[in-house]
Amino acid sequence: MFSWVSKDARRKKEPELFQTVAEGLRQLYAQKLLPLEEHYRFHEFHSPALEDADFDNKPMVLLVGQYSTGKTTFIRHLIEQDFPGMRIGPEPTTDSFIAVMHGPTEGVVPGNALVVDPRRPFRKLNAFGNAFLNRFMCAQLPNPVLDSISIIDTPGILSGEKQRISRGYDFAAVLEWFAERVDRIILLFDAHKLDISDEFSEVIKALKNHEDKIRVVLNKADQIETQQLMRVYGALMWSLGKIINTPEVVRVYIGSFWSHPLLIPDNRKLFEAEEQDLFKDIQSLPRNAALRKLNDLIKRARLAKVHAYIISSLKKEMPNVFGKESKKKELVNNLGEIYQKIEREHQISPGDFPSLRKMQELLQTQDFSKFQALKPKLLDTVDDMLANDIARLMVMVRQEESLMPSQVVKGGAFDGTMNGPFGHGYGEGAGEGIDDVEWVVGKDKPTYDEIFYTLSPVNGKITGANAKKEMVKSKLPNTVLGKIWKLADVDKDGLLDDEEFALANHLIKVKLEGHELPADLPPHLVPPSKRRHE
């Protein structure tokens, strides 16, 4: 008796089990969020429906910049290989969107074929028409870098209204479509000719809902002197501050991202450190891909909820018979007041609402009589997903991340940053002398010995109190000096002999020169007399 009640209750109590985060996101979207989107025509206003390929695809990196800022050369530098369809030159060369992806053989897949392939995440680009699809292709090639990530090369952004109109498709809208689905957006600027055209400003503004994905690269920085570089960097930050309206400062990487010799090598160390940081950021993408997809689904769910409230409010205000057209105009003009009313009634953050101007434009062409009234059950299902299902998936995300290596992307330029004499920081700081036969501290030991014998050694060793008097002269914080003491006291007897004291001073010098201290003492820094204990 009442078996239908018990089944329903049991279904609510038992959480759904997923094998992977991607499978969980796919099922949650199809079962809980998609019905809300379809009921309130979300896809006509904001973004096409997600497909299976959107949840399974590799992390993607989108490169955006004005012409001749080095976008295609940047890809060539990363993968260390020419790719089909690649054109490089000082004039506007890349006139297409090129998805550089892994494939068993080299080749090009045209846009019209790409958008009918269910294994690719590009099917919804069909909506931008033939003018765009004729300017879209996939360059396939076997490459170890592309095993882990895909890279989207874009046409160089030009100045002037003529070029914008002659494209034949909405360039900013296409970029916005990609921005929703990629894991990283890299904006490239040329340090030698810094200029932000009107179209580029519009493009950056179109990406404003994805600031967390944006990184900026100031490329070709080896072509200018240090003083000029500082001025260019300041001008870039000032320009970006006017376009990207966020309190946080966007991360800018400075360098020269190609394999040619540096024209002005003054800032070589800076460029190496910046390249290393950017590579680490890109290498982290596969590890963080599941979290990014989860975050994007949450953002989409919040927008879908707000959209449902907007559409149902408009439906509620519409008359049943007469004066529909005049009422529609009135509602569109007063959409800002409807936003405020929804914000108050449902305690929704202003940041969750879509652009007022864009929404007004889209509503002009809609038939309000086809809008649906509020259906609380659909909203409750999405609320339940956000409150419970997403929390369970977060646990799975952390588990999947812990099983992945920290740097998944390998091959190409990424191999050049690995261990070896040309690895970043090799032979510097605590690594100095790593390949020397002699103990690297030995060359300065006579100087340290003079200080050591003024500190009243007993049986060839000084106490911690006496060592502290000398070590604090470095003005380093006690936390740092405490770490240096632990590293230098190799035999852990609470005292320092002459070699250990020399080692402590060497580590102080390393820190004062701006290098990090090692977590454990490297073998080449162990004093010669202690090496037999190792």
From Swiss-Prot:
Superkingdom of source: Eukaryota
Gene3D superfamilies the record matches: 1.10.268.20, EF-hand, P-loop containing nucleotide triphosphate hydrolases
Region (G3 motif): 153-156
Keywords associated with the record: Acetylation, ATP-binding, Calcium, Cell membrane, Cell projection, Cilium, Cilium biogenesis/degradation, Coiled coil, Endosome, Membrane, Metal-binding, Nucleotide-binding, Phosphoprotein, Protein transport, Transport
GO MF: ATP binding; cadherin binding; calcium ion binding; GTP binding; identical protein binding; small GTPase binding
Similarity comment: Belongs to the TRAFAC class dynamin-like GTPase superfamily. Dynamin/Fzo/YdjA family. EHD subfamily.
UniProt name for this protein: EH domain-containing protein 1
Purpose: ATP- and membrane-binding protein that controls membrane reorganization/tubulation upon ATP hydrolysis. In vitro causes vesiculation of endocytic membranes. Acts in early endocytic membrane fusion and membrane trafficking of recycling endosomes. Recruited to endosomal membranes upon nerve growth factor stimulation, indirectly regulates neurite outgrowth. Plays a role in myoblast fusion. Involved in the unidirectional retrograde dendritic transport of endocytosed BACE1 and in efficient sorting of BACE1 to axons implicating a function in neuronal APP processing.
Phosphoserine carried by residues: 355, 456
Localization (cell): Recycling endosome membrane; Early endosome membrane; Cell membrane; Cell projection, Cilium membrane
GO cellular component: ciliary pocket membrane; cilium; cytoplasm; early endosome; early endosome membrane; endocytic vesicle; endosome membrane; extracellular exosome
